[in-house]
């Protein structure tokens, strides 16, 4: 009976050793015997961009004589209908419209340091109060007309404020002075 137990134990051990050798490769030292896959790197810039050959057609914003203000500042001045659509968009998003104006400089400028600081041109004067509860975009444009009538030489921007997250979500120039 003792010989029977020992022979079955040896058989079990020999089976486990064959399974182990098939599952794990033998240790060959610290240097790997197989090489890493090598991929050819393409340094052509047109293959990296998603628009291919149109990279050559892109233009640069002219920095002389044209200031970059807010969102959409790279576009020509918005027409009345375009302003109406932008205000309708911010109302659809549930944002509160607000009007702000600046009499001197409608852009970020350097006053207190060599680099623009926290207060350098970022804060404008608010026109009245935020328009909580406004559902009609034409009401916002009427307020815009009032600002322009009161301060024709001012920069005026429309802001969409999210009162739940308490952040400004959109801001764009609605009026620039004729002299600018």
UniProtKB/Swiss-Prot annotation:
Pfam families: RbcS, RuBisCO_small. Transmembrane segments: none annotated. One of its GO terms (biological process) is reductive pentose-phosphate cycle. The gene is RBCS.3A. Its main location: plastid. Residues 1-56 form a transit peptide. Heterohexadecamer of 8 large and 8 small subunits. HAMAP family: RuBisCO_S_bact. It comes from the Eukaryota. This is Ribulose bisphosphate carboxylase small subunit, chloroplastic 3. RuBisCO catalyzes two reactions: the carboxylation of D-ribulose 1,5-bisphosphate, the primary event in carbon dioxide fixation, as well as the oxidative fragmentation of the pentose substrate. Both reactions occur simultaneously and in competition at the same active site. Although the small subunit is not catalytic it is essential for maximal activity. Binds to abscisic acid (ABA); only half of the possible binding sites are occupied in the crystal; and there are indications this is a low affinity site. The keyword Plastid applies. The basic functional RuBisCO is composed of a large chain homodimer in a 'head-to-tail' conformation. In form I RuBisCO this homodimer is arranged in a barrel-like tetramer with the small subunits forming a tetrameric 'cap' on each end of the 'barrel'.
């Amino acid at each position: 009976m003792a010989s029977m137990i020992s022979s079955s134990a040896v058989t079990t051990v020999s089976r486990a050793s064959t399974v182990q050798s098939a599952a794990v490769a033998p240790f060959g030292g610290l240097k790997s015997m197989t090489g890493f896959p090598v991929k050819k790197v393409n340094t052509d810039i047109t293959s990296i961009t998603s628009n291919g050959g149109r990279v050559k057609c892109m233009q640069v914003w002219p920095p002389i004589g044209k200031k970059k203000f807010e969102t959409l500042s790279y576009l020509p001045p918005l027409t009345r209908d375009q302003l109406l659509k932008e205000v309708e968009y911010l109302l659809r998003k549930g944002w509160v419209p607000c009007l702000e104006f600046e009499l001197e400089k409608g852009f970020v400028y350097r006053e207190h340091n060599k680099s623009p600081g926290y207060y350098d041109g970022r804060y404008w004067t608010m026109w009245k109060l935020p328009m909580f509860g406004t559902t009609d975009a034409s009401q916002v444009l009427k307020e815009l007309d009032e600002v322009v009538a009161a301060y024709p030489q001012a920069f005026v921007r429309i802001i969409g404020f999210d009162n739940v997250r308490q952040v400004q979500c959109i801001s764009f120039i609605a009026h620039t002075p004729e002299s600018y």
